Amino acid sequence: MKKILVIGESCLDRFVYCHAERLAPDLPVPVLNVIEETDNPGMAKNVERNVLSIYPHCELITNDNWKNISKTRYVHRNSNHTFIRVDAESRVPRIALHDLPLKEYDLVAISDYNKGFLTEADIQSICERHPNVFIDTKKILGGWVKDAKVIKINNFEYERSKHAITPELCERVIVTRGEQGAEYRGVLYPVPEKVDVKDSTGAGDSFFAALLVRYAETGDMDESIRFANACASKVVVQKGVTLIERPSALAYEQSKNI
């Protein structure tokens, strides 16, 4: 089996589930009564965990201080409405490029949340040194991604970067479009079935992880996008950050026939 390496910064994803039944007497804000708290590794660690949930050969290079970087969401227990997100950030040390064992892996995935772990020059260097680099980045795209195999971005990221996406680069860009599915080379790949979205947190990581796994298994990008759509559609129907599972045979076969 092919080996996957994920590179990128990680954090702690914390969900604080609450009830809110009254406003504070001194301020026009709800009083939150905490019911439950959950912690999960996030960002690049979430990509790695999703890959490992369905594929055995994946390793991660990330920042050691990831537990000091947190995203805390205060969420209404019943409606799943997020009241507020509070971020606590620490300095992320830059990666040591000379230590990267890229040749040991068949696919290299860059999960870049633009926190300082990877610069544009670092990513460009990795792409120049390996033929199969998949990128998911929060940075505005530019010439530094020209040697990537695939760049996965969402609608918002596409709008910010479209001025820099040349016709040649466009051939390597996958745009995830939420409930519509994903677009690649002018073709829209719809989700296999309409679902009731409860929480889209981490859905991009899940899509990216499933894309990596299926491409490692098949080398077929069309097949990989359909598989990623099917996996991500199973994640968004659950609360919080959840791991992907192999989609049901029926749902996945339906997606392949679209």
Regions found by a protein language model. Name each.
Residues 2-4, 12-109, 120-122, 245-258:
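Conserved N-terminal subdomain of the carbohydrate kinase-like
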Residues 5-7, 85, 107-110, 134, ...:
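Structural motif
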Residues 9-10, 113, 206:
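Active-site metal-binding loops of divalent metal-dependent hydrolases
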Residues 60-63, 134-137, 153:
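Short internal beta-strands
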Residues 75, 148-156:
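Non-cysteine beta-strand/loop elements that form the S-adenosyl-L-methionine
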Residues 89, 113, 138-140, 156, ...:
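Active-site beta-loop-alpha junctions enriched in small/polar residues
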Residues 104-107, 121-143, 147, 160-258:
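Conserved phosphate-binding/catalytic region of the ribokinase-like
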Residues 113-119:
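Active-site glycine- and acidic-residue-rich loops that bind
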